[in-house]
Amino acid sequence: MNKFKYLLFLVVFAVFFLTFAFFDNSSKSHQDDDEQKPIILIHDVSPVYFKELKEIVKIIDKYHYQNRSYLFLIVNHANKYNLKNYPEFVDYLHKLEKEGYHIEFHAYNHIDDEFNCNKTVAEEKLNKSFKILEECGFNPKKIKYFIPPRYKLSEDAEKLFLGRNITIILENKMITEKDGKIVEISITNREYTWYLPKPLVKVAEKIATTDYKLSIKENRKFFLSIHPKAVNYGSGLEFLDYFLNETSKN
């Protein structure tokens, strides 16, 4: 009898262990799949492109990419479009944030290579920018990523952002600070929709799919950069719809 109970215990334990292992591995596999999906970087988010942003968001929402989409804001575009003066646009950004979109920082006015400057100028612009964000109801402490305009920035500006625990995203790498050391991480950051004409959309789709698969194979994060207005031209949105559909299947 004792032997029977012991065998029964082993069977029950084995079933429990295998079930747990299956669901644990399934969960890890699902998490790994999600981590491999593209991260969408939306540059130049400002009231100037309100209509265009809505068109982009419609496609992102269609494939449930909200949590992997990052909105890089220009807080005072061309020194004419201060976020404080556009409450409807700000409310829309808050709505997107609640839905999972990430609010990040791109520029103060986006004039020239504005953060390719000395420490004093960089600090002044960043402080002004964060003040505007606060006045619009955003929490600057939640800003984790920065894309410099035209991917240009000085060493002084780099130190400033890293000192505030903000990771810098460039064309082929991310720069961050870990345990007091500056770390550079290789990434794939591509833009296929810069005023993409209709005849080239299929070519862009094939190139993007190849780049994405190669990035996964080489264990690099894949970033899809898009600019409002540029992506809304020609077949840009058609490409975006295709690419998110393909990558959402993983």
From Swiss-Prot:
Pfam families the UniProt entry points to: DUF2334 (PF10096)
Subcellular location(s) of the protein: Membrane
Membrane topology classification: Single-pass membrane protein
KW Cytoplasm (keyword) present: no
TM region positions: 4-24
GO biological process, alphabetically ordered: carbohydrate metabolic process
Keyword Nuclease belongs to the record: no
Record keywords, A-Z: Membrane, Transmembrane, Transmembrane helix
SS bonds (residue pairs): none
InterPro entries in UniProt: DUF2334, Glyco_hydro/deAcase_b/a-brl
One Gene Ontology term, aspect cellular component: membrane
Protein name: Uncharacterized protein MJ0505
